[in-house]
Amino acid sequence: MAVIADPETAQGFRLAGLEGYGASSAEEAQSLLETLVERGGYALVAVDEALLSDPERAVERLMRGRDLPVLLPIAGLKEAFQGHDVEGYMRELVRKTIGFDIKL
């Protein structure tokens, strides 16, 4: 699993044991997202919606003809994780999205 968020939030994900990639602009986030999808190796890539200019269009365009990774735009990543259990939150979000629980 990979997470694209602002640099500070990405660092928090790395500290929690996930692969966090920091982006400071929509262009940087889009480039990272394209790179991660093309490179492969991830079943799930979560990205902070605030970093995408048009989240639905970005996901639709990148995933055309692909099954993996699952792209999961998430609103307010930074605010959601201040003082909370990052791993537990992501596990619950993944469970709701794909229908079963996984150990991150």
From Swiss-Prot:
InterPro entries registered for this protein in UniProt: ATPase_V1-cplx_f_g_su, ATPase_V1-cplx_fsu_bac/arc, ATPase_V1_fsu_sf
BP GO terms, sorted: proton motive force-driven plasma membrane ATP synthesis
Keyword set includes Transport: yes
Entry keyword set: ATP synthesis, Hydrogen ion transport, Ion transport, Transport
UniProt GO MF annotations: ATP binding; proton-transporting ATP synthase activity, rotational mechanism; proton-transporting ATPase activity, rotational mechanism
HAMAP family, A to Z: ATP_synth_F_arch
Biological role stated in the UniProt entry: Produces ATP from ADP in the presence of a proton gradient across the membrane.
Family: Belongs to the V-ATPase F subunit family.
Name of the molecule in the record: V-type ATP synthase subunit F
Gene that encodes the chain: atpF
